[in-house]
């Protein structure tokens, strides 16, 4: 997923699929990245938030905080999980 330079990244586990606006992979957290347990502030310079693997409580906390400070930006949610094939094989009858 491509992440804007003016986005805030909030994560529970760091994803392996983030790229910045120039196409470089963001390998490790940087100064615009926080865990859900850390404190952070939203201001007008932040245009969007990327939530990575949030729990339902994390989503609710972010939504309440966004509403309380009247922040007008976008929230994007990224869920990462293993792609496990089904335990059976699909067979075409033709």
Swiss-Prot record:
<protein>
    <recommendedName>
        <fullName>Core protein OPG142</fullName>
    </recommendedName>
</protein>
<keyword id="KW-0347">Helicase</keyword>
<keyword id="KW-0806">Transcription termination</keyword>
<dbReference type="GO" id="GO:0030430">
    <property type="term" value="C:host cell cytoplasm"/>
</dbReference>
<comment type="function">
    <text>Late protein which is a part of a large complex required for early virion morphogenesis. This complex participates in the formation of virosomes and the incorporation of virosomal contents into nascent immature virions. Required for the stability and kinase activity of OPG054.</text>
</comment>
<keyword id="KW-0238">DNA-binding</keyword>
<keyword id="KW-0067">ATP-binding</keyword>
<keyword id="KW-0547">Nucleotide-binding</keyword>
<keyword id="KW-0946">Virion</keyword>
<dbReference type="GO" id="GO:0044423">
    <property type="term" value="C:virion component"/>
</dbReference>
<dbReference type="Pfam" id="PF05846">
    <property type="entry name" value="Chordopox_A15"/>
</dbReference>
<dbReference type="GO" id="GO:0003677">
    <property type="term" value="F:DNA binding"/>
</dbReference>
<comment type="subunit">
    <text>Part of a complex composed of the kinase OPG054, OPG092, OPG100, OPG114, OPG115, OPG142 and OPG157.</text>
</comment>
<keyword id="KW-0378">Hydrolase</keyword>
<keyword id="KW-0804">Transcription</keyword>
<dbReference type="GO" id="GO:0004386">
    <property type="term" value="F:helicase activity"/>
</dbReference>
<keyword id="KW-0426">Late protein</keyword>
<keyword id="KW-0597">Phosphoprotein</keyword>
<dbReference type="GO" id="GO:0016787">
    <property type="term" value="F:hydrolase activity"/>
</dbReference>
<dbReference type="GO" id="GO:0006353">
    <property type="term" value="P:DNA-templated transcription termination"/>
</dbReference>
<dbReference type="InterPro" id="IPR008445">
    <property type="entry name" value="A15"/>
</dbReference>
<keyword id="KW-0805">Transcription regulation</keyword>
<comment type="similarity">
    <text>Belongs to the orthopoxvirus OPG142 family.</text>
</comment>
<keyword id="KW-1035">Host cytoplasm</keyword>
<dbReference type="GO" id="GO:0005524">
    <property type="term" value="F:ATP binding"/>
</dbReference>
């Amino acid at each position: 997923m491509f992440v804007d330079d003016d986005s805030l990244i909030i994560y529970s586990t760091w994803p392996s699929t983030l790229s910045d606006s120039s196409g470089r992979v963001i390998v490790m957290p940087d100064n615009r990245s926080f865990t859900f347990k850390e404190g952070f502030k939203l201001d007008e310079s932040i245009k969007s938030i990327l939530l990575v693997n949030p729990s339902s409580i994390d989503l609710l906390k972010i939504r309440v905080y966004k509403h309380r400070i009247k922040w007008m930006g976008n929230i994007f949610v990224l869920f990462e999980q293993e792609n496990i094939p089904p335990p059976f094989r699909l067979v075409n009858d033709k």
